[in-house]
Amino acid sequence: MPLQFMYGPASIDHLEGIADRVIELQQQNVGQPVYYLVPNHIKFQSEIQLLQKLRQRRDVKSHIFAEKDVQILSISRLAWFFLRNSSIYQYPRVTSSSSNMLLYRVILEHQDELTLFHNIDAQLGLVQKIATQLAEFKQGNVGPDELGRVAENIAENSDAGMDIKAKLHDLGIIYSAYEEEIQSRFIDASDITHTLTDELSKMDLSGQSFIISGFSNFTAEEMSLIQALMKANGNVVIDLIMDKFPLYEKVSENSLFFENEKIIFKFNAWAHENKVKSLEPVRLHRVRVNSDLLKLEKYWIESSEGQVGGSKQENNACVTIFQANSRYAEVEHVATLIRQKMAKDPSLKFSDFSVLTRHLSDYSTIIKPIFDQMELPIFYDLQIAMKDHPLLELINALFDIRAHHFRYEDVMRLLKTGLLFPETEDDPHGMDFFKSVHITENYVLKQGIYGDRWLQKKDWKYSRFNDIDEEKQTDEEIEINQRINTVKNYVAETVVPFFNQLSTATTGVEAAKALYDFLIKNGIDQCLLAWRDQWIEEGRLAKAAEPEQTWETFIQMLDEFVDILGDQPFDPDNFMGLLNAGFEGATYSQIPSTLDQILVSESGMVQMVDRKIVFIIGATDRVMPEQIQDNDFLNQDGKNQIDPFLDDDQFLRISNDRQMRQEPYLNYLTFMIGSDELIFSYPKSGNDGVELKISPYVERIGKHFGIIAQSLPSRPTTEPVRLDPPFIELFIGSNRSTLSHLIQYARAMHEAKSEADPRWNLIYTILRQSTLGSLTDQLLSSLEYKNIPEKLKPEIVEGLYGDTIYASVSKLEEFYRNEYSYFLKYGLKLQERETSDLSPADTGQYFHAAMDKLIKMITTENLNFNEVNQEQIEQIAKRLVQQMEQDQQFDQFNGTYRMGFLRKQLDRTVQAMVEAIFKQLARTRMRPIASEQLFGQIGSQSGLPALNFKVGEGKEINVRGKIDRIDKIEIGDKDYLGIVDYKSSNRKFDFTDAYYGLAMQMLMYLDVVQRNKEKIDPATKAEISSALYMIFQYPLLKSKEWKGSDANQLNQSIFKKFSLNGFLLKDEELIKEIDKTIEDTRKSDVFPIAFTTKGTLTKVSENSILSEDELQNLIKHAELKVREAGEKIFKGELDMNPVQWPNRRTVMEYSPYKDVMQFDAMLPENNYRIIEKLDKDKVLEQIREEQEKNGR
């Protein structure tokens, strides 16, 4: 029953020595088994490699080889090997989820006895920490009784803090109760190990051998197991990494191999005490790395122990360091290097390479896409967590919908899992339904829908009212209405019955049954199986295993919940907390790599040393050395207080200080994984943009060996760069990746106007001859690309617009603001995604509807404005607001409290507008005779004839719209008609904009009025009086406007804020009579007119007055601009010519199409259309001259 140690530094081929020892033991104990015990993570590869070495030693030529007396096992598999027929394996294994549930139940049942856990509901996260702590106790051979003893000793120690005393008091109670529960129904890994230890102690293992390798430390229970092997007369050989065997009892904490030396001393002391024979240690000598890596090893061992030595490298190529600008550039260069090394050395295989980093999560979204592009196969040696699977997301969303009462985010999360949909013959996989979901999401966002509106019986109504041309109930809108109501009804009909069932559940088992029934009834299990079958068909076997494993894990957790907490009162929050906690630790089973693949793994994990070239990426000071976090339930200080009271065979996980001291050793193991080459790399900045620094370990190595870290550019340039290897080689990888860099280089060369490097010309030639030839030419042609829209082909114009363009005036104004933007918006019909925030179009629609209702009230009730008092005005305003609340098209205001608040703000403005309009009408003889007057066909409605303009052979433009308000005034024997246009901000008639086609609306409206005077007012032959803007606003006064003012003065100041702007006809009688109060003040508070003391119009007022000829010329000019716009649109002309006004304001400032247009004023081909500032007289003069010139 001897104990023997084998040792040697990491540069030695330990597996060779183990293979030799296996054969020796077999020869010494013929027919007896040899067990090779390794960490579970490397068991599969260890088995393959050891058998290969044994096959070579036995000179077996066949590739098929087996050893019946050699077993390669992990410790857990060793337990199965010896105990598989015992009763212990009849018990269900405790999982992380069942452990959490048991602890949760234990804490609930003993809450009155506990000090820290009065409210476990609020501390569910602590349950996981306690579970981890109890597992550490069990692995440390510290049972409930031992913990109770320790707690008593510490409680008697006056120096101990109250925190540790309270924690140990509670842990003692919880641990004892937890173990009682475990023993009665489950078995966990520690119990199995302890049972194996007990059973082995009773066996006679004489002649049987156990070789243990790959461990950096052992838990107390693992040490007890190994000691049991020796007690049972087994031959135990422990293989450790160290350069020399310790000769003295005292271990130096400065030694790189401190932990391994402690293992030796512990086992030797135990062997001596138990009279177990210790054989002479065996020093392994067969070196597996090259001379440069041996020098690195020698330096690292000596420098870590304070003895700096070593010599310069003979070949700098064996250890290199490079810095990249980003993690992306870093990984891209690693992949490029792998391809180049394989190209230069055909004997290299993918499996000769390993890419390691301390935390793969830093590179989780980078490595696979880059290696796929580089056509490099990888084995991603990291277990994938189940917690992000759609099944768990569906259950979480389901419970969140119930908890937050149909919040938008939760409902969409549920529907977007892809698992819940109505299965029909026409749509068996729900593809059409998911299209409806996306449409519904846009509608819900726009309307701000949540809560009871998902449950209402009344159908949702989809409508668009931000543009008059969109008011027609199109077939598309009818379809959208059907789709959104299909989704609404499906959600209500599907989840509400489940919620009702869950509400009646009083115990955990009733709730679990309700959830299970819901999932089965809605075919969730069948959908998961369909996913599996689809991925199997596509050959994605690893992906295909995920749905089934997730479902099995969920069912197991549900069974555990029913078994452990089924009789407890049901709490939805705690149920989901336990379910999420269970999935947090659940991972998919991974198939070990047997293919020729590059290993991508984490450097903190034990690795096989079967690679030739190792890349250590992300070698920064943040992770090398690792920053140890102390997040355990018992912190390090607490464990230090426990340690003196533990027996020799009891100890907890190594301390944080010892972990930090072990960092040089763990990194040393990583350095020595490869046999031929070691390459360090690190990025200048992380994913968060924070600057990163090189690891002090790597910095030490570089400084000692004179290795200069190369700072590698992320893209090629035309400037000469001195690097080794040559600069150009940095960018030659797969055809696809090389093409990307060729484009970058060509662009840099194009911009610098320099000659191309002949080597890049050669690369271009090679790529053109490859399968990427056409793509290469296509991408290179982009260098000549200019951001200039192409003229549309006639067939495209025909498809977009037909023979007739139906447009509102505002659309045509948008054309003159930027022709390309018009094409995007009205040709391609690109729209921004609507949200529940109020847009200017939404508020404008609301105000327009309110004013329309008001004007109809006024004309219907035939009010006398001179006699209406303040109280009556307020009553009318109140009635108007009530009517608006009942208008279904504004249901979006019922979506949220915020929208309700905004509606109150709008209503307050409406009430102010009502009062202002009544006061204005009391001062003038102008009276509204029409509101929202249609012209042209809009949807199913029609009004006055549209304005039709021929713009070429068979083409025409049909201008239609709504005039907000038409007013009429009678002066003497003459009648006048004027228009009022509502605006959300102060507006004056801008003659410059009118000239350039940017302000045609008022002029075209007047054109409609004068063409249809008899239809508007058949009893009269009216003339045009005015075109005026009225602002929608809730007026605010500046301090100078209200200071020292009485109530009447304040009301007057507020009233002035609503004064109308625009222009009036130059008609002396009209101007004098339009405002009855103007004689008193010489200035109208309603209209833009004022008189001097001499009785003439002021200069400002002159700008608001137009003669009949001037007005007609402006209208003709607007008609001309409409025709010109139509001609350009039908010709397919698409200039990107955004307007820039004289104040340097541009139309691009608020354009939603910036990302589409990519307009850049710095580009020579992109220019603003500069608008020259013109005053009224200049505009009228230029229009007159142009019309005379063209004979109009």
UniProtKB/Swiss-Prot annotation:
Signal peptide: none annotated. One of its GO terms (biological process) is double-strand break repair via homologous recombination. Pfam families: ADDB_N, PDDEXK_1. InterPro entries: ADDB_N, DNA_helicase_suRexB, P-loop_NTPase, PDDEXK-like_dom_sf, PDDEXK_AddAB-type. Keywords: ATP-binding, DNA damage, DNA repair, DNA-binding, Exonuclease, Helicase, Hydrolase, Nuclease, Nucleotide-binding. GO terms for molecular function: 5'-3' exonuclease activity; ATP binding; double-stranded DNA binding; helicase activity; hydrolase activity, acting on acid anhydrides. It comes from the Bacteria. Its cofactor is Mg(2+). Its EC number is 3.1.-.-. Transmembrane segments: none annotated. SUPFAM superfamilies: P-loop containing nucleoside triphosphate hydrolases. Heterodimer of AddA and RexB. Belongs to the helicase family. AddB/RexB type 2 subfamily. The heterodimer acts as both an ATP-dependent DNA helicase and an ATP-dependent, dual-direction single-stranded exonuclease. Recognizes the chi site generating a DNA molecule suitable for the initiation of homologous recombination. This subunit has 5' -> 3' nuclease activity but not helicase activity. Despite having helicase-like domains, this subunit does not have helicase activity. PANTHER family: RECBCD ENZYME SUBUNIT RECC. This is ATP-dependent helicase/deoxyribonuclease subunit B. The gene is rexB.
